[in-house]
Regions:
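Extracytoplasmic gate region of multi-pass secondary transporters
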Residues: 43-45, 231-289, 373-381
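Conserved MFS/SLC helix-loop-helix module at the cytosolic interface between two early adjacent transmembrane helices
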Residues: 74-113
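Helix-loop-helix hairpin linking two adjacent transmembrane segments in secondary transporters
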Residues: 153-203
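Helix-to-loop junctions at the C-terminal end of transmembrane segments
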Residues: 75-87, 285-298
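Juxtamembrane intracellular "pre-TM" segments in multi-pass secondary transporters
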Residues: 9-18, 202-238, 435-461
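Cytoplasmic helix-loop-helix junction between adjacent transmembrane helices
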Residues: 118-157
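Helix-breaking motifs and short loop linkers at transmembrane-helix boundaries and internal kinks
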Residues: 55, 87, 108-114, 142, ...
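Cytoplasmic membrane-interface "Motif A"-like loop-to-helix N-cap segments
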Residues: 85-95, 294-308
Length: 469
C-alpha cells in the first residue's frame, strides 16, 4: 500500500497540492472510521439488555461480542493488498455496507448465533476503515502531512468511542437498545452513500507513484509473517502492547459501564461518561506519547514506563471497593493516559524487524493486540460468571466485579515483564514515526501472482516426464 516507507518520493511529494476536494474525500472516509469505532464499543452501554434478549451469561456475551475481533484481526492483514488491487472506493463501499447491515442483523431475533453473526459482519467491515482512510490520505495529500492526518483520524476514532459509550447510553435509556442499533444501521447506510458519491474510483496520483512499491522486491505474505513471528522481540512488543490495550478492551468496549455502575452506585449514563474518560485519556496522551518517543528516541523505556503506570492504576482499581462517580472519572482518565503509550509499539515492531517487512510487522502486531483484546473480554466474562455462581444474571454483584477485575493488573504485570525484556531498537533505518503509526493496521502486502502459484504447483506436483513412476 502506498503509505509505506519510500512509497512516495520526496520530489514528487512536493508537487501534491492540498485541496478542498482532498479534505472532503479524506473526511468522508474518516467518518467511516468514527462510525466503526462507535459500533465497536456500543455494546458496553447495553450489556444487560443484550444478555436479557439473547439469554446469555457474562461469558457467553463476551464470546459473542468478541466475534468482532476474531474476524477483524486477520482481515486487516489483507486490507492493504485489497486496497492496492481494487481501489479505495471499491473496498470502502462494501465494507461500510457490511458493517451497517451487521447492525440490522443484530435486532432481527433473539438467538445468540444471530448476535455473533452480526458482530462478525461489523468486524469484517470495520477492518478496512482506518487503512482505507490513510490510503486516501496518501493519495490526496503530501507525505509530510500523513502524521497529522493519522492523528486526526485516530482522534475521530476516539470521538466515536466516546459517543458509543456515553452518547448511546442516553439513547438506550430513552428509546431502548433496539432503536439505538437500528439508528446506527441507518447512519451506516448514509455513510455508505457518502463514500459512493464522494470517493473517486482512482486516486489523483496513484498511477504515478504506486510503481515505487512494486519495484521493491519484498517477501511473500507467509514468508513475511514467518520473519516477524520468528523474532522474539516481535512477541515481546505484541504482549506489551496487548497489556496496555487491555483496559480499553475490557472496560471501554464491554464491561466498564456495568462495573462502574456496580462499584459507584451511579446510573448507567454517569457510568458511561466515566468510561468515556478512558478514550479521552488516549485522545490526549496518544499524540504526546508519539511525539515524545520520536523526539527522545525512546521505545522500550517508554513502553516500560507505561507498563508500570498501567499496572499501578489497575491495582488502584482493584484496591478501591467504594468509589464516587467523580472518582471514577478521574481514575478512568488516568488509566487511559497511562496506557496510551501503546501507540509506540507499532514503531517499535517496525524497528525490530527488517525494513522489507515493516508493513507486516505493524499489521501482525496489531492483529495480536486485537485478537488478544477480544479474548480478554471473554476471560473477564468467564471470571464474572464464576464469582457470581454462574448462569444468566440481570446484574452482577459488586463483589463479583471486584474479583474479576483482578484480571487487569495480572495482564499488566505480564506486559510489564515483556517490556522489561525488550531491547531498545536501532534507529538507523527509515521507519514510520510513532505518532504516524498510531493505529496503523496494514501498510504493504505483496501480491501473490498466478505464475508463482503455478511454479509452486510444478515443484510439488511434477508432470509425467519428471516422474519416474
Amino acid at each position: 500500500m502506498i503509505i509505506a516507507e519510500d512509497a512516495l518520493g520526496d520530489g514528487a511529494d512536493e508537487k501534491i497540492p492540498i485541496t478542498l476536494r482532498g479534505w472532503v474525500i479524506w473526511g468522508v472516509a474518516a467518518l467511516f472510521y468514527l462510525y466503526e469505532f462507535f459500533v465497536r464499543v456500543a455494546p458496553s452501554a447495553m450489556a444487560p439488555e443484550l444478555q436479557e434478549t439473547f439469554k446469555l451469561s457474562a461469558a457467553g456475551l463476551g464470546a459473542a461480542i468478541g466475534t468482532y475481533y476474531i474476524i477483524y484481526s486477520p482481515s486487516q492483514l489483507l486490507a492493504g493488498s485489497f486496497l492496492d488491487r481494487f481501489g479505495a472506493k471499491n473496498i470502502l463501499v462494501p465494507a461500510s455496507l457490511v458493517c451497517s447491515l451487521g447492525c440490522f442483523l443484530e435486532v432481527l431475533g433473539h438467538d445468540a448465533f444471530l448476535l455473533s453473526a452480526a458482530r462478525f459482519c461489523q468486524g469484517l467491515g470495520s477492518a478496512f476503515a482506518f487503512v482505507g482512510t490513510m490510503y486516501l490520505a496518501a493519495e490526496w495529500f503530501p507525505r509530510s502531512t500523513l502524521a497529522l492526518l493519522s492523528g486526526l483520524t485516530t482522534s475521530l476514532g476516539m470521538a466515536g468511542a466516546i459517543i458509543g459509550n456515553s452518547g448511546i447510553a442516553h439513547i438506550v435509556e430513552k428509546l431502548g437498545w433496539h432503536a439505538s442499533i437500528i439508528a446506527a444501521g441507518v447512519l451506516g447506510l448514509v455513510i455508505t452513500a457518502l463514500i459512493y458519491f464522494v470517493v473517486p474510483h482512482k486516486g489523483r496520483h496513484h498511477l504515478e507513484h504506486a510503481t515505487t512499491v512494486q519495484s521493491v522486491r519484498r517477501p511473500g505474505i507467509f514468508s513475511a509473517l514467518r520473519i516477524v513471528y520468528s523474532n522474539p522481540q516481535s512477541w515481546l512488543v505484541g504482549i506489551s502492547g496487548t497489556a496496555l490495550y487491555m483496559p480499553l478492551s475490557i472496560l471501554g468496549a464491554l464491561w466498564g459501564v456495568e462495573y462502574i455502575s456496580s462499584v459507584t452506585g451511579g446510573n448507567k449514563v454517569a457510568a458511561a461518561g466515566a468510561v468515556s474518560m478512558l478514550y479521552v485519556g488516549w485522545l490526549i496522551g496518544g499524540p504526546i506519547a508519539g511525539w515524545f518517543s520520536d523526539r527522545t528516541g525512546m521505545r522500550r523505556n517508554l513502553l516500560l514506563g507505561a507498563g508500570v503506570a498501567t499496572f499501578i492504576t489497575t491495582l488502584v482499581v482493584v484496591c478501591i471497593h467504594s468509589l464516587s462517580v467523580k472518582g471514577a472519572y478521574v481514575l478512568m482518565l488516568l488509566m487511559g493516559f497511562a496506557s496510551t503509550s501503546q501507540v509506540v509499539c507499532f514503531a517499535t515492531a517496525v524497528e525490530h524487524n527488517p525494513k522489507s517487512v515493516s508493513g507486516t510487522a505493524i499489521a501482525a502486531t496489531n492483529m495480536m493486540i486485537m485478537f488478544l483484546g477480544g479474548a480478554g473480554e471473554w476471560m473477564f466474562g468467564v471470571l464474572l460468571d464464576h464469582f457470581s455462581g454462574g448462569g444468566v444474571h440481570d446484574s452482577y454483584p459488586a463483589q463479583a466485579y471486584h474479583k474479576a477485575i483482578l484480571l487487569l493488573p495480572a495482564i499488566s504485570a505480564i506486559g510489564l515483564v515483556a517490556a522489561f525484556f525488550l531491547t531498545e531498537p536501532s534507529r538507523k533505518k527509515l521507519v514510520l514515526p510513532a505518532d504516524a503509526a498510531l493505529r496503523v493496521e496494514s501498510v504493504v502486502w505483496p501480491k501473490i501472482s498466478l505464475s508463482r502459484w503455478l511454479h509452486w504447483l510444478r515443484r510439488w506436483y511434477p508432470g509425467k516426464k519428471d516422474n519416474p513412476c
